[in-house]
Amino acid sequence: MQNQQQTFSAKEINPLQSLDEWEDDVLERYPEPDVKAKDKSKEEFRNYETPGRDTVKEFYRLNHTYQTYDFVKEKKNNFLQFDKKEMPVWDAFNFLNQLVDDSDPDTDLDQFQHLLQTSEAIRRDGHPDWMVLTGLMHDMGKVLCLFDEPQWAVVGDTFPVGCAYSDKIVYPEFFKNNPDYVNPDYNTKYGVYEKECGLRNVDISWGHDEYIYQILKDYIPEEGLYMLRYHSFYAWHREGENSYLLDDHNREMWKWGKRFNPYDLYAKNP
């Protein structure tokens, strides 16, 4: 199935009212009582007038339907040549400022403000400079929107492709629409991988995590790279799924991702 040849409607390209809508859904699913947002309880987040969250559900229907093993390979081949556009970092930050929508009920913050708050919270807690930089850059991969990429190919919980899907991934029922679900090469426990092969050998669904990791992989320590590459892989670091693909080094390194996750989720402050 050649997903890049498929034509999507405007609604299918942008099912969410804003990219923050996905992040707020994650916040609702994974609250941490010991981390408080200033003047706002966890129960107050995601206060939409329509409680059905139809846009988030539609977003995941599209994400789980079209994020196939072949789709991920195609996107890597397309975008990891880094031949699309060149811009200074501050221009990229200015672009991220456009990725906010008045329909987001939780905050009027743009994406750049979220990055500033994340990095400042990390600095305030005395973490090393490389981690502060990681916080500042962790969502920079959302510049994929510059290239008219569908939202579901930029944000969303990430997961391994090329093997069976975990039922702990949000809205797992939508994977039945994915052609890999019935492909015997991809729908077994290990799929195209070997037991404990290590995440470096596993393809993860395509989006901003992988893109910014590939951009920065030669510039920050490995601990920060784990934070970048897997910060949306909630089925692993919140649910403990796909442990059979991990090697000992993955298990050791994830403690750094665990340190980063609260800053990503809970630093957002209006």
Which ranges hold each PLM region?
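Residues that form generic nucleotide/phosphate-binding pockets
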Residues: 59-62, 78-82, 92-99, 215, ...
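Active-site flanking loop/helix segments enriched in acidic
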Residues: 77-113, 194-199
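Alpha-helix initiation and N-capping motif
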Residues: 72, 86-93, 221, 253
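Tryptophan-centered motif/residue detector
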Residues: 22-25, 90-93, 130, 206
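N-proximal short alpha-helices
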Residues: 62-65, 69, 87-91, 105, ...
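Non-catalytic interface/linker regions that flank or bridge core catalytic/transmembrane domains
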Residues: 1-87
